[in-house]
Amino acid sequence: VRLVGSEMCIRDSYSPAGTVLISPVALFPTESMARAVMAYLGAASIIGAIALASWMVSRRWFHIAFPLTVSFFFITPEPVQWTLALTNINGFMLLLEVLFVWLSLRLREKGVGWKGHFNRPEAWAAGIVAGIAVSIKPQFGVLFIVPLAFAQVAVVAVAALVSIVTFAIGWFTIAEPELFFTNLVPYLSEPRPRFNGSIGGLAIVHGWSDATVMALTVLTVVGTLAAVVTLWRWKEVDPVMFSFTAIAVCFAGGFMVSGLMQNYYAIWFIPFVLTVCRPRSPMHWPVTVLALLLTVANPLWPATGNATIDEMVTHMPGFMFMALPLIVATWGAVQIVKDRSEPEAVVEPESLRSN
């Protein structure tokens, strides 16, 4: 079974569950038609995700953030242009990310307790969305930071059920499902030197020592955990900002310590970028904006003639992914200190402001 773009063989690129979910693209009679459909649907998914995320951060369908965000991300080379050029699945995954957060926050608003969640359609819908996302790309397990924060056991249970069922269907229906364990898992466990901005990939390119790799890995993991800890109180103050920001830092940290980080993964930061519309957000810090600009504008940098500098600039997105959790952790710590020194500056919980 063949897919178009950069992921040429579904069976060799995904788990049995992911293969089942993506395989309908192979039903198109020609590759050119499949490419066109994937590109148009991918663009529609990205625009739809930005529209919904814009509404979530502003509570207005026609907020200026929507056209500005669409224009900016469709103009810059990374991440949208490459996503569409390669006709990969990442635009659809962005839509699943935003839908999941929207459904989870709607469930939170019901206030029925974790047992009552099992009777809510929002929990089932969120679980199905998460189950599909994790089945296609296991890295989307970071989405579960949201139901963890809001004690949404039902969402996790439904997602697990969907993942198990789709994996079982794939295992018994696709050819040679054992290749997932014999080929794909070993391949993903080893960082590759090309098109890989993860710590492992950068280490191969720059010849870093094992000690350097270990130090950067520990720093990234600690920074990601610190970011989540300092953000935790915002889950009640501003659940939208908390959810999009926590997912972004978990994505950034997770990709850097895993075996693969590609620049167009920054597409899943777009909801975080939109939190600039919230009363308080790490996106209000110029250093955060600079880090994200260096991520998306990297391919535009001209060559300097210095091999070392050019190599570092080429891999700038990887360094920015590594820096993002540390930046957010610092922002969160500063907000804690500020609120303790200026009690009147503390923002009331969103639930109180709406009453």
Go through each PLM region and give its residues.
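Membrane-interface alpha helices of multi-pass inner-membrane proteins
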Residues: 122-138, 142-147, 249-256
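Flexible gly/pro-rich beta->alpha loop and the following alpha-helix that scaffold active-site loops
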Residues: 326-329
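Short, well-ordered alpha-helices that flank and scaffold nucleotide-derived cofactor binding pockets
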Residues: 150
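Active-site oxyanion/phosphate-handling segment shared across diverse enzymes
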Residues: 292-295
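Primarily membrane-embedded glycan-assembly and transfer machineries that use lipid-linked glycans
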Residues: 1-2, 6-7, 11-124, 153-270, ...
